[in-house]
């Protein structure tokens, strides 16, 4: 799911004079009798002390040379708890004075950073030979503008007629919508108007046999520290109607799911509240409801840090008690497991599944899946967020975190894919193993030719742990979310993606890609 981290559009201005001065400053610090390598090592130690005190040390080569001063300014405002000046960073930050410790290490970063990041890996043309072909169908909400920000799509048989329905959220127009993607109907229908919904889950919270909806409400489209977010329980009523209960006063809520964590028979609500800089947490709302018309929940804060973008309940260690896995973005860039201690008081033991190598990793989402079919649960992780700085990064991609029986999991990079935002595993080609479908979203405004970047792709598992890349859609990646399922009942897996308008209007809200496997 998508979490916009700041209003996109970084400044294109580059201060060539300042860069030259910074590089010269770095060189000039080398004193008499001190080798260049020794001086560089001293600078690096100082950089680790200054830039590694709040998060993992960011090496200079993760950003181009011209971006580092803007990055330092951004970090300064975060560290000081202040809002940055309004406007393109390159212009707005020009007169900002950095603190002494940052001024001292900035020349090191500028001198060691590349002029430009390396070009992203090239991907096959969609017309290249592939084991599968896909046919696109476009779905939209009648009367709505072509500027959707579809943050989540989910396929589920909501009305229990044996066919998959589509549920989705649009965080710009403020809609929860539904559709029948397997039919000839191209119209999506509004279920509810909610200001900025980010995520939707189906669960029977009151255990009355009728499916309910859980909606994560952000409160505002663009990031800010506030308490305008909400957890919304849309209680299922007769004839497909819903009654909404708002549990408000939250930071920006990124996702919510239901599971019984204390063993009392009532589904509790697990909440990933992304927040922004000062706000945000991971929490469980203990379900104390006796009368569904008067919901009652008690909050148990599990992790007080901001940046949780997704949370999935699961009995990870198979002891009969519900645990959960969450992904902390922001400066943390960590996948965490919270193992239920079984004390009935919502106590968990935190375990690190994976910690990214640096704080600019761009974590964007994960799926829990047994990718190697060895009987345990692995993590399929994507990291491709560009909404902090708009820069297309060659190290963004898809990772398999293999569960080998302990923590952390073992990391395998499966493919590099700029802007990758979501990946899911399924047997797309019908050969018995799991393949991967991935979609990408870029903030726009980069200096990379976006016509050459994949927007939707699939990875064919050709042998255990080895994947061949195939492009379904090329150019202008604008998909924050996807889901997989057999929409037409022909026995193979089709793809549904949500569209996220960045700049020009788009022709549809949701695209269905029908698998043409013979």
Label the model's feature ranges.
Residues 5, 18, 30-31, 206, ...:
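N-terminal non-cleavable signal-anchor helices
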Residues 25-39:
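Bacterial Sec-dependent signal peptides at the C-terminal "C-region" and cleavage site
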Residues 16-28:
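Bacterial N-terminal signal peptides
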Residues 1-12:
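N-terminal secretory signal peptides that target proteins for export/translocation
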Residues 36-518:
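Beta-propeller-forming repeat regions
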């Amino acid at each position: 799911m998508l979490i916009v981290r700041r209003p996109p559009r970084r400044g294109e201005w580059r201060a060539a004079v300042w860069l030259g001065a910074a590089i010269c400053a770095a060189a000039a610090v080398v004193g008499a009798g001190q080798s260049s390598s020794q001086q560089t090592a001293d600078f690096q130690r100082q950089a680790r002390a200054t830039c590694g005190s709040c998060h993992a040390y960011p090496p200079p080569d993760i950003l181009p040379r011209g971006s580092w001063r803007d990055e330092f300014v951004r970090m300064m405002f975060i560290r000081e708890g202040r809002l940055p000046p309004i406007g393109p960073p390159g212009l707005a930050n020009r007169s900002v004075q950095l603190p002494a410790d940052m001024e001292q290490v900035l020349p090191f970063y500028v001198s060691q950073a590349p002029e430009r990041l390396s070009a992203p890996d090239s991907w096959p043309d969609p017309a290249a030979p592939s084991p599968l072909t896909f046919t696109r169908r476009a779905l939209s909400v009648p009367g709505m503008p072509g500027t959707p920000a579809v943050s989540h799509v989910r396929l589920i048989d909501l009305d229990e007629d044996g066919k998959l329905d589509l549920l989705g959220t649009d965080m710009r127009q403020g809609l929860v919508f539904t559709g029948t993607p397997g039919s000839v109907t191209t119209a999506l229908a509004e279920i509810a108007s909610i200001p900025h919904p980010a995520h939707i889950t189906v669960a029977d919270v009151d255990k009355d046999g009728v499916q309910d909806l859980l909606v994560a409400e952000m409160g505002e489209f663009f990031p800010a520290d506030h308490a305008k977010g909400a957890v919304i329980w849309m209680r299922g009523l007769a004839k497909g109607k819903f009654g909404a209960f708002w549990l408000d006063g939250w930071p920006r809520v990124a996702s919510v799911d239901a599971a019984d964590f204390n063993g009392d028979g009532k589904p509790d609500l697990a909440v990933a509240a992304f927040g922004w800089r000062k706000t945000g947490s991971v929490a469980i709302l203990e379900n104390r409801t006796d009368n569904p018309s008067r919901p009652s929940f008690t909050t148990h804060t599990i992790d007080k840090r901001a940046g949780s973008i997704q949370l999935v309940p699961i009995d990870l260690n198979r002891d009969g008690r519900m645990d959960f896995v969450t992904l902390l973005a922001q400066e943390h860039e960590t996948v965490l497991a919270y193992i239920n201690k079984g004390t009935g008081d919502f106590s968990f033991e935190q375990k690190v599944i994976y910690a990214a190598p640096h704080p600019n990793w761009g974590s964007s989402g994960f799926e829990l899946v047994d990718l190697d079919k060895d009987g345990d649960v692995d993590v399929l992780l994507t990291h491709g967020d560009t909404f902090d700085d708009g820069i297309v990064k060659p190290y963004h991609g898809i990772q398999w975190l293999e569960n080998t029986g302990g923590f952390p999991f073992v990391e395998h990079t499966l493919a590099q894919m700029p802007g990758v935002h979501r990946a899911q595993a399924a047997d797309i080609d019908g050969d018995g193993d799991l393949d991967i479908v991935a979609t990408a979203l870029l903030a726009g405004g980069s200096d990379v030719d976006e016509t050459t970047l994949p927007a939707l792709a699939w990875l064919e598992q050709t042998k255990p742990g080895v994947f061949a890349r195939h492009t379904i859609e090329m150019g202008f990646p604008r998909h924050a979310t996807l889901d997989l399922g057999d929409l037409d009942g022909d026995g193979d897996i089709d793809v549904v993606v949500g569209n996220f308008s960045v700049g020009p209007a788009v022709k549809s809200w949701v695209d269905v890609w029908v698998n043409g496997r013979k």
